[in-house]
């Protein structure tokens, strides 16, 4: 019987990296490198935000550890879903077309005190803090992000919800003239603007966080600026971006 002796430089087939994994890694490394080159540009854009003086905010010690290292900003910016601007993960440039000043948030519905607040007026009424949360995507990837914002509960309480209010509805902007994903095409049948919802109990949970900043600076447009939701116990699609209305 012929027995083949493996040479020292040979490895078994089981140890060979599959082609698709190799190609995906190459694509990821290329994306990360490109994002790193754009990082300084993104920082400059953040400095132009009128709320820049509010950051960084004090870290809330209760939410100082998500059990994993914080994901670098250049990776976060380079791998992000924001379907209003297309299906590519690299939507940071497309999102820059969105103007975030002026920007107002309407709070209405089954409340005793409906209000409409410009984003900068809203920021004057809340206490910003930093929380480190894990962000999980239904696509089977996750990140750890140092978010800055305030509890959803504090905003809901401003509007004084009535006893019959059972749910909270969120609505994003609708600007197809700048948001290419809202234009006729792949998502043309989707009923824009995007909406999400929570039970009142979920909305009043202390974990529910309205985000206006990240990494010690105003929130980048590609991450949902000027205001988005983050729910660390739910998949990312529930954390709606670019909020203009809460009912």
Listing of model-derived features with the role each one plays in the protein:
Residues 27-48:
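N-terminal export signals
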Residues 49-247:
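Structured, non-membrane catalytic/scaffold regions adjacent to prosthetic-group chemistry
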Residues 21, 25, 49-50:
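Short linear motifs in intrinsically disordered/low-complexity regions
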Residues 25-26, 228:
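Short, cationic motifs built from Arg/Lys/His that form the positively charged side of catalytic pockets
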Residues 1-23, 34-37:
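N-terminal secretory signal peptides
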Residues 1-8, 42-50:
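Basic/polar N-terminal segments that are highly enriched at the extreme N-terminus
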């Amino acid at each position: 019987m012929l027995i083949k002796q493996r040479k020292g430089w040979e490895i078994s087939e089981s140890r060979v990296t599959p082609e698709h994994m190799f190609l995906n890694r190459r694509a990821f490394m290329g994306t990360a490198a490109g994002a790193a080159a754009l990082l300084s540009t993104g920082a400059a854009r953040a400095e132009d935000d009128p709320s820049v003086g509010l950051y960084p905010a004090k870290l809330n010690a209760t939410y100082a550890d998500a059990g994993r290292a914080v994901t670098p900003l250049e990776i976060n910016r380079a791998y992000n879903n924001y379907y209003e601007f297309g299906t590519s993960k690299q939507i940071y440039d497309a999102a820059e077309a969105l103007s975030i000043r002026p920007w107002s948030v309407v709070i209405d519905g089954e409340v005793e005190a409906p209000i409409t607040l410009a984003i900068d007026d809203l920021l004057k009424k809340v206490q910003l803090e930093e929380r480190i949360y894990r962000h999980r995507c239904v696509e089977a990837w996750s990140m750890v992000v140092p978010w800055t914002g305030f509890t959803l509960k504090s905003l809901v309480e401003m509007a004084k919800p009535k006893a019959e209010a059972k749910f909270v509805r969120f609505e994003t902007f609708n600007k197809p003239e700048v948001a290419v994903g809202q234009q006729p095409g792949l998502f043309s049948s989707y009923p824009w603007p995007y909406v999400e919802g929570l039970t009142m109990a979920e909305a009043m949970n202390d974990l529910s966080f309205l985000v206006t900043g990240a990494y010690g600076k105003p929130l980048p447009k590609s991450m949902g600026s000027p205001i988005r939701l983050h729910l660390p116990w739910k998949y990312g699609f529930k954390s709606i971006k670019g909020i203009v209305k809460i009912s």
